[in-house]
């Protein structure tokens, strides 16, 4: 995966855990070692959204310490905040230079697994539902429209929203995701990057009609699946929990009109493989196309016959769900560091 994540002008992802120090824990309340932040930085990640349903797993202190660790690792973050002043500094917006194009990033979650945010810490988490501890079905239009208006006031070239939404283990988006996407696009979002389902969901352009009759179009990736996790059909009995993709978006700014658009979309099909021996798990994030080609040319050092069948299943899943037409990234670029 590093060849792809390191070569991009800007790499973003969803950090769905806390970094609260030992003792570490898995499901249902996550806490990972601090090394994860440094590892992500070392393979080229530039920004993570920390707004998801697990960000409150260790309470406000866990949320706060997670951001401290990310700062120490020099990994930018969006979606959660330690103080009111930290939120007010940029109104929940992080502006990044992406290959000479300015992009405003915002991060939101549907909820927190029922864990409430204390009244005096309301600033700490960006959520897009009013009922974020309940049904999670009432859009906070006032909050979203206000923060997107602020993002627009910055006059960046593009606005990207990273959002935790949808239903776990569903390979299609639901009507509420589409409703939220339409609201975001109509209020200025150009790109929407979704997560939460733990399996891939469709991607593509979406056009909305505004109140004045004009239209506005944005690109939506409803979910890319698990970039790395211990989930697989064998562990959770759900297909495609080990299937993911690295999304690559090409942004182009017109020198005459100054308009910036997404001019190319592609993805890299990936498979998360546990090569553990039973004593210790060892997870690899495999480039599906590259290893299928290696196996076909006689190199079975990684792509054994057993692994090959998993690669084919992952490729079929990506093509069926994400669209075969977007699988055109080609061979991985050369990495620049060890």
Identify the role of each PLM range:
Residues 1-338:
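Acidic, metal/ion-coordinating pockets
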């Amino acid at each position: 995966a590093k060849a792809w994540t390191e070569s991009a002008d800007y790499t973003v992802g969803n950090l769905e855990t806390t970094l609260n120090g030992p003792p570490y824990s898995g499901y249902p309340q996550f806490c990972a070692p601090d090394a994860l932040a440094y590892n992500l930085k070392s393979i080229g990640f530039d920004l993570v959204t920390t707004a998801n349903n697990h960000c409150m797993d260790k309470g406000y202190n866990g949320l706060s310490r997670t951001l401290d660790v990310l700062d120490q690792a020099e990994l930018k973050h969006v979606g959660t905040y330690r103080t009111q002043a930290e939120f007010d500094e940029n109104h929940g917006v992080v502006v990044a230079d992406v290959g000479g194009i300015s992009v405003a990033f915002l991060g939101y979650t549907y909820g927190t697994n029922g864990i409430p945010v204390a009244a005096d810490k309301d600033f700490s988490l960006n959520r897009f539902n009013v009922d974020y501890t309940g049904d999670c079905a009432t859009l906070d239009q006032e909050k979203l429209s206000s923060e997107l208006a602020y993002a627009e006031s910055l006059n960046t070239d593009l606005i990207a929203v990273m959002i935790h939404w949808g239903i776990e283990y569903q390979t299609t988006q639901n009507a509420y995701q589409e409703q939220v996407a339409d609201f975001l696009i109509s209020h200025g979002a150009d790109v929407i990057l979704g997560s939460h389902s733990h399996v891939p969901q469709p991607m593509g352009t979406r056009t909305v009609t505004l109140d004045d009759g004009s239209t506005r179009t944005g690109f939506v990736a409803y979910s890319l699946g698990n970039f790395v996790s211990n989930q697989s059909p064998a562990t959770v009995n759900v297909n495609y929990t080990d299937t993911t993709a690295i999304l690559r978006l090409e942004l182009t700014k017109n020198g005459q009109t100054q308009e910036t658009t997404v001019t190319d979309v592609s993805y890299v099909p990936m498979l998360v493989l546990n090569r553990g021996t039973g004593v210790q798990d060892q997870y690899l994030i495999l480039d599906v196309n590259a290893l299928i080609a290696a196996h076909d040319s006689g190199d079975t050092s990684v792509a054994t016959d057993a692994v090959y069948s998993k690669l084919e299943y992952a490729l079929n899943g990506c093509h069926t769900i994400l669209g075969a037409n977007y699988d055109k990234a080609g061979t991985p670029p050369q990495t620049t560091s060890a």
